[in-house]
Amino acid sequence: MFRQRSIQNLVRTIGVGVHSGRRVELTLRPAEANTGIVFHRVDLPQVVDLPASAIGVGDTRMASVLQQGNVRVSTVEHLMSALAGLGIDNLHVDLTAEEVPIMDGSAATFVYLLRSAGIVEQNAPKRFIRVLKPIEVREGEGRNEKWARLEPHEGFALAFSIDFRHPAIDSTANFAEIDFATHSYVREIARARTFGFVNEVEALRSMGLARGGSLDNAIVMDEFRVLNSDGLRYDDEFVKHKILDAIGDLYLLGKPLVARYVAYKSGHALNNQLARALLEQQDAWELVTYESQAEAPQAFRHEWKLA
C-alpha cells in the first residue's frame, strides 16, 4: 500500500520570526501514524497543541496563522509546504515562540532539515483528498478581482497568475504551471523566497508585521528593482513563491490533494476560503487510498521516492 510517512530522528534549528522579529527554536519530532501535523507551543506555562487544520486558521494577514483562543502559531505555510512536497503526514512541531522561523524565506531549509532527520514509511495507508467537482472562491471586482479554484485532476498540479504591476516583477514570468507528474518540488519550488517592498515596511511594522524581515530572508524591492545583491534564484521566483505558499495553505486540509489548483492573485486568505469551501461541500471530494505505489498518480510516485 501507499504508506504514511514521518521522520526518523528529532531535528532542531533556531531562527527568527519574519513578522514578530523574535528568536524562536524549532524542533521537529517523529509522530505516530494518523497523528497528522501538530504544532506545540512549548514556551507557555502549559503546552498548547495546535493541529494543522484549515478550520484552525484564525488570521491570514501576510501569513497563515493557527489559533486556539489567544494562543497562536504564525507563518506555518513554508513548513507545511515542505511537508507536502516530501509527502510527510505525521509530525510534532515544537516552538518556543508564536511564529515558525522564516529561515531564508523559502521552504529549502525545512526540506534540508526533514531530509536530514530521515524520512520513514509507517504501517498505515496514506489517505488523499480527491476532488470530484470544481470548487471556486472569488472576491473583489475589476482590477481588484482575485480567485482560486480546485478542479478534478488525477495527480497534483498548480497554475498561478500574479499581477503586481511592478517593473521588477513584470520583467519576470507572471504565470507558472507546475504538474508534479513531471516537475520537482525540491528543485523547482522549494527555493523560491517570499518577497516584499521597501515602501510597505513602515506600515507593516506598525501593524506588528515584517519586524524580522531582511535581505537575508526575503526578496526586497524598491520602486524599480530587486535590492538583493544575489538577484533571483529562479527567473519566475515571484510566482513560484506564490505556488509554494498555496501548497502549504492547501496542506492544512490535513491530507494531500488529488486535484488541480488554478488561481489568479490569490493569497493566504483566499486559499483558506477555498480549503474551507471544499470541506463544506462534501459531495465535491472523497477520501482515497492506493493499494500500491503503482496505483497512485505519477505526481506522487515521482517526488516521494525514498532516498
From Swiss-Prot:
It is an enzyme of class 3 (hydrolase). Belongs to the LpxC family. Catalyzes the hydrolysis of UDP-3-O-myristoyl-N-acetylglucosamine to form UDP-3-O-myristoylglucosamine and acetate, the committed step in lipid A biosynthesis. InterPro entries: Ribosomal_Su5_D2-typ_SF, UDP-acyl_GlcNac_deAcase, UDP-acyl_GlcNac_deAcase_C, UDP-acyl_N-AcGlcN_deAcase_N. One of its GO terms (biological process) is lipid A biosynthetic process. GO terms for cellular component: membrane. One of its GO terms (molecular function) is UDP-3-O-acyl-N-acetylglucosamine deacetylase activity. Zn(2+) binds at residues 78, 241, 245. Its cofactor is Zn(2+). The active site is at residue 268. It catalyses: a UDP-3-O-[(3R)-3-hydroxyacyl]-N-acetyl-alpha-D-glucosamine + H2O = a UDP-3-O-[(3R)-3-hydroxyacyl]-alpha-D-glucosamine + acetate. This is UDP-3-O-acyl-N-acetylglucosamine deacetylase. Its EC number is 3.5.1.108. It comes from Bordetella pertussis (strain Tohama I / ATCC BAA-589 / NCTC 13251). Pathway: Glycolipid biosynthesis; lipid IV(A) biosynthesis; lipid IV(A) from (3R)-3-hydroxytetradecanoyl-[acyl-carrier-protein] and UDP-N-acetyl-alpha-D-glucosamine: step 2/6.
